Amino acid sequence: AASDVYKRQVLQFITHFTDSYSYYDSACMALEGGCRWIQLRMKDAPVSEVEQEALRLQHLCRDYGATFIIDDHVELVKKIHADGVHLGKKDMPVAEARKMLGKDFIIGGTANTFEDVKMHYEAGADYIGCGPFRFTTTKKNLSPILGLEGYRSIVSQMKEAGIHLPIVAIGGITFEDIPSIMATGVTGIALSGTILRADNPIEETRRIINIEKINNK
């Protein structure tokens, strides 16, 4: 099922609206470049607009056999049967979302500390979006920056606690950062700006997926 595809993905692409690209364009390019895990993130947009965009993107992701999740909008995820939801620190708690959605939907939670990870794990999250790695322009109100040391520390505390969850690094990550971030033990990376700022976002997505394939051999 498309909803399981994300478990084998190193790259999660987060849609972003820029001067050059719409949310839909940005998702098209990431999918064309080989990404199979897309998150629609439209902070502060009216729900009706998010729904319109989500239906188009969901259709697109299904064509590519990609996992499609939506940031924050739990009710919408349930209504249109998206694959899952990503919940930020100020969004609905993971446990509450799990009650609403049941076990068949993916729920990801944002974490900045091991305590956050533990809380999400106990609440039934399927993966963790962990960051920020460094300062990022696509997000307002950032938590303290983790850097490589922060990831190493969280990954080792997870091992000690016997917590096995995919952990996706996020926040201002560039192409050059990827090998050293993956070496900390995280399972993936989430990108937005890095891909969209490239001269050719499709090629950039391919390049990112390829460095990962090389590193995993």
What is each stretch, according to the model?
Residues 1-6:
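Short, small-residue-biased leader/transition segments that mark boundaries at the very start
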Residues 8-22, 107-110, 169:
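Active-site mouth loops of central-metabolism enzymes
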Residues 14-16, 37-49, 58-60, 64-94, ...:
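Catalytic beta/alpha-barrel core
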Residues 38, 77, 120, 128, ...:
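Conserved, mostly hydrophobic/aromatic
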Residues 39-49, 132-143:
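Glycine-rich, proline-tolerant flexible connector loops at the mouths of alpha/beta enzymes
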Residues 51-69, 89, 97-112, 144-168, ...:
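Alpha-helix-loop-beta-strand connector modules within alpha/beta enzyme cores
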Residues 68, 73-83, 112-124, 168, ...:
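Catalytic cores of alpha/beta
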Residues 89-96, 129-142, 178, 182-205:
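Glycine-rich phosphate-binding active-site loops on the catalytic face of alpha/beta enzymes
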